[in-house]
């Protein structure tokens, strides 16, 4: 694993001891989550900007930002302690390419247009698409990290999905919404 990803994992485990940001207690529990965050880089189109919704403890945004330092990432996280953790990461890791915004998706009013919108374990795909599509440029994609519940979601229809173990990567172009 990339040394910067190891640093991220170490810091997350340290913060978990007092702040309970994720369920992981050991590196062996975090490594698969980091691998999961990076897996889509094998199949998604290149992108120059990304909006991550509900960034939480930084998955998938922080591993992606560390692997793609040339890409601009905006991390939306409404909860104070998680936003504080993300800001701390930005101060101690080479993450000049991220901006942390302490807001809910529904409150965010920036007119930006990004190439990719990501989310992991936040909400139903239809809801995420409806509330976030205004931030996605016309050639952009949604990338949602989903479990088996995706099969029950309406947004799943006519969507390119990639499956690895129990993870379903929902990958849908904005232009398919028309």
UniProtKB/Swiss-Prot annotation:
Organism for this UniProt entry: Helicobacter acinonychis (strain Sheeba)
Protein name: Ribosomal RNA small subunit methyltransferase G
MF term (GO), any: rRNA (guanine-N7-)-methyltransferase activity
UniProt cross-references to SUPFAM superfamilies, sorted A to Z: S-adenosyl-L-methionine-dependent methyltransferases
Intrachain S-S bonds: none
Gene name per UniProt: rsmG
Pfam family, one: GidB
Organism placement in taxonomy: Bacteria, Pseudomonadati, Campylobacterota, Epsilonproteobacteria, Campylobacterales
Recorded superkingdom: Bacteria
Subcellular location: Cytoplasm
Family label: Belongs to the methyltransferase superfamily. RNA methyltransferase RsmG family.
């Amino acid at each position: 694993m990339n040394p910067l990803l190891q640093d991220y994992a170490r810091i997350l485990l340290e913060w978990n001891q007092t702040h309970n940001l994720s369920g992981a207690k050991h590196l062996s529990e975090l490594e698969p989550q980091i691998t999961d965050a990076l897996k889509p880089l094998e199949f998604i189109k290149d992108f120059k900007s990304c909006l991550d919704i509900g960034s939480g403890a930084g998955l998938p945004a922080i591993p992606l930002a560390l692997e793609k330092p040339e890409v601009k990432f905006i991390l939306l996280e409404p909860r104070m302690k998680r936003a504080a953790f993300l800001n701390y990461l930005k101060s101690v890791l080479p993450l000049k390419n991220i901006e942390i915004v302490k807001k809910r998706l529904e409150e965010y009013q920036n007119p930006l247009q990004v190439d990719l919108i990501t989310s992991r374990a936040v909400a139903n795909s239809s809801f995420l698409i409806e509330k976030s599509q205004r931030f996605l440029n016309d050639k952009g994609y949604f990338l949602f990290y989903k479990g088996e519940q995706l099969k029950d979601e309406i947004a799943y229809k006519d969507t390119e999905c990639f499956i690895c173990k129990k993870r379903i990567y929902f990958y849908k172009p904005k232009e398919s919404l028309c």
